[in-house]
Amino acid sequence: ITANSRAPEERLGDLEAQLAAQRVGEKRLLAMVETHGEARVSAHAEALLEYSRRMTEAVIERIPDGEYRFEDAMEGDGQGEFHIPIRVSLRVMGARMTVDFSGSAAQVAGNINAVEAIVKSATWYCVRLLAEDDVPVNAGCFEPVEVITPPHSLLNPDFPAAVAVGNTETG
């Protein structure tokens, strides 16, 4: 992994920090299971997922059912100047939301492409901003929100598309 980076020492430090955090989390989880039992810890984890899902659904239910559209564009990809549309359609039905980026530009040669994970993360973050209370971030809060990113697009490019700026500008 680090061989594919211009700053391998930095990436190695990042990876080591992530691994250390995972090891601490593993120890704490095992300690909770030791103290409270696997069934009880699992039940509480499921309850937390359900709580986050319900809180996110409540946020979505405050939005009137319907379809909402928005379009913007970038004026170039760093390789040249041309119109690069980003289109989104937001469909709300009760406690469910679909955010569809179909119709957005195809992937480009420059580094403004954004990988699907960035687009989903930015979308879910926007939904969370609508919440009046803190929503615990876990898989439960993602369930009511479907994010569609068309393949081969600016927002879901094929490997090895350039994506460096997509993390901050496009996503």
Please place each PLM-identified region on the residue numbering.
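Hydrophobic core positions in small helical hairpin nucleic-acid-binding modules
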Residues: 12-13, 110-111, 115, 124-171
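Short beta-strand elements
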Residues: 84-103
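Flexible loop/turn segments at secondary-structure boundaries
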Residues: 77-81, 97-98, 105-109, 137, ...
